[in-house]
Amino acid sequence: MNDRDPEFATKAVAVIELLLSPPTDGPLFCVDEKPGIGVRQPTAPDQPPVPRGPPARGRPARREFEYTRNGTVDLLAGFRVNDGRVCGMVRLKHRSREFCELLALLDEQTPVGQPIHLILDPVSSHWSAEGVTWLDAHPQRTFVFHFLPVHASWLSFIEVWFSILSRKCLRRADFADASIATQQIEAFMSTYNTHMAHPFEWKKGVRFYKRLKDKIAARSELQLAA
């Protein structure tokens, strides 16, 4: 539990309860960025494994450890808690401007008239003047921001999905340039939504949730006693 945010328990409980029981009036997205995805390519191709047996002694696959680095890309994405589908985009940066692009993408994929609920970090790009201006220019859509406590990204389901992306797409991937990295990440998101998407379950533990609730109750009692 991280107490750097004095309202950690209250904010965390609010987020957990949203994840346990998503709003019924519109979709709930866990939103975040995965920055610094390496665009790199090994200087030599992989060598396949050699089967063991006469006359060969066999050996495992070999992978070149030297790479040519060609920068990085950033993924901005939202995990829809209601059904487990992912909506995202790959960019070279993840500023307020790109965050507004993500909001526009979520807007496009949500039926008219439904509010869009977002669970997200309280970082500057998520509540900047540029973002406020964008929201004011799109009054036809209501966005409801539910901010995580400080340093509590791990509460969000999008972090779980980012780990899936890393294991299944990025771990051994080679990208010659940013466009190829973008294509492969977008292809994985499409494949995931078609064949693997499912709602996640809260697995941090009932005891953890109860501990937070007890902390809030104890604080309330102290305030009443004062």
Regions of interest found by a model, annotated:
Residues T10-A104, L212, R219:
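Extended, low-complexity cationic-aromatic segments
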Residues F29-V31, I116-L120, H146-P149, K203:
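Short beta-strand segments
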Residues I158-I180, N193-M196:
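Active-site proximal helix-loop segment of RNase H-like, two-metal nucleases, encompassing DDE(D)
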Residues R97-H117:
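Short, basic/hydrophobic alpha-helical segments
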Residues M1-K11:
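Short Lys/Arg-enriched helix C-cap and helix-to-coil transition segments
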Residues I180-A226:
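C-terminal domain-tail junction helix/linker
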Residues R57, R62-T68, A137-F157, A173-F175:
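RNase H-like polynucleotidyl transferase catalytic core
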Residues H94-R95, L118-E130, P149-L155, I180:
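Acidic, metal-coordinating catalytic cores used for nucleic-acid/nucleotide bond scission
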